[in-house]
Amino acid sequence: MSTRSSFADEEQNKVPRIMTFRPSYEEFQNFSAYIEYIESRGAHLAGLAKIQPPAEWVPRKSGYDIDNINMTIPAPICQVVTGAHGVYQQINIQQRRQMTLRQFMEKANSELHQTPRHFDYDDLERKYWKNITYISPLYAADVKGSLSDEDLDVWNIGRLDTILNLVNTDYNIIIDGVNTAYLYFGMWKSSFAWHTEDMDLYSINYLHFGAPKTWYAIPPAYGRRLEKLANETFSENYQECNAYLRHKMTMISPKVLRQHNIPYNKITQEAGEIMITFPFGYHAGFNHGFNGAESTNFASKRWIEYGKRASICRCRSDMVKISMETFVRRFQPERYDNWLKGQDMGCHPEEPGKICAAAPPTLNEYEKQENLRAAKSEEESPQKRGCSLAGNGCERNAESAEDVDDKASVSSYSSCRQLQPVVKLRKLPTIASVPEPSSAPKRYDFNTEAVVRVKRLWNELPCPDRGANLLTNGVVKNTKRMRFQTKVLTLDDED
């Protein structure tokens, strides 16, 4: 027992610690360059870093008098927590009635929700975990907007100007809270559950005013350990969705993390301080009282490998999914073709030695060009016996074909948006019913040949244009129902 404890202590001593940086105003001028600098110092190894901005940086010159902040919270959420012994599930119930920021502050400072008396931050942390399931707090999360001045040019969270802007530039897509700013107004015990950022992106969080915020962070190198613990503890949730931690519902206490030898760090963010989370850095935390923060995501070239291999929740339609096509094409041109083919072999940055192919997009230019050439070749060759297609050609690789009978269906992640084609397919006899001349040198399995033909016809089904669906491939995992989009080939038996 002592040997195991000694080993755990030794490993904990090797865990990267959260670093705090105090840049000068000159060093603070270039956001992306400074992120590269703190990573050169190893800040990313802990998954979280704190930055204390220079005194010259004033994001809001008018201050934070609540009466001067014209802000309405459209749908605050009530956080209901269930569970015991350090393992909890947090359910966010959206309230129907909107609130002004002043009303929210008065609620936060009321006797029911005010911060309890405490000696220090450690004492307050103990009270948090002891009372986590009692008196559900309100949290004003994901509120569109910014508290920063529009003319703020340095570290303006609403426009950080990183490569994540390419999502808007190339796809003309704006994702609220990802490439725009979100505001968060908290009260005592309002929490953010264990999660990594959407697509394992970076994030920046600036605490504009109010009570502190406690953060927990797991170094990215140990992120899989947390996933394993969560998947075993909440196995039903995992069976429903193998990326269910992205639902941001799971709270696990530091005590339980220690029991399972999962290294973590803890830090308190004060008003006026910035927190940076790094790719695949799991983090969680809670607010000490009424406060206001501003946050968004950003990216760097180092993130691209994380993004290509990020887990994606497919059971919720509102989950953020970003095409990696523009990033691979621009910054990894030597790997682009292989990536499109699903042959971009490599490791997840936090799992060295575990080689696998990065998931390709479901639709891409390579597939289109290949199928265009195949379609052209078929047009030049005589039509094969028994098959004709009523409809347009298509640029799509085959997925799979099922039973060749009076009708067939094939699973696909992308449904066609055109008229359903009708395929006239002569029903082929089985090999047992086909007379075989004694001199025949070959045996033909006509059922197999029919499947091949249906696959070819499937390739020719009309599909959306490039850019309409560039999401990552992956298996939809659900024990209660399998969610697939299907296209139907209607087979007409002329025999």
From Swiss-Prot:
Assigned keywords, A-Z: Chromatin regulator, Dioxygenase, Iron, Metal-binding, Nucleus, Oxidoreductase, Phosphoprotein, Transcription, Transcription regulation, Zinc
Family: Belongs to the JHDM3 histone demethylase family.
Sites bearing Phosphoserine, chain numbering: S409
Binding positions for 2-oxoglutarate per the UniProt entry: Y139, N205, K213, K248
GO MF, any single term: histone H3K36 demethylase activity
Keyword Transmembrane helix: no
Boundaries of every JmjC domain copy: 149-315
UniProt domain JmjN: residue ranges: 18-60
Sequence positions that bind Zn(2+): C241, H247, C313, C315
Gene3D superfamilies: Cupin (2.60.120.650)
Catalytic reaction annotation: N(6),N(6),N(6)-trimethyl-L-lysyl(9)-[histone H3] + 2 2-oxoglutarate + 2 O2 = N(6)-methyl-L-lysyl(9)-[histone H3] + 2 formaldehyde + 2 succinate + 2 CO2; N(6),N(6),N(6)-trimethyl-L-lysyl(36)-[histone H3] + 2 2-oxoglutarate + 2 O2 = N(6)-methyl-L-lysyl(36)-[histone H3] + 2 formaldehyde + 2 succinate + 2 CO2
Primary residence: nucleus
Gene name tied to this protein: Kdm4A
Protein name in UniProt: Probable lysine-specific demethylase 4A
SUPFAM superfamilies for this protein: Clavaminate synthase-like
GO biological processes: chromatin remodeling; circadian behavior; negative regulation of DNA-templated transcription; positive regulation of gene expression; regulation of gene expression
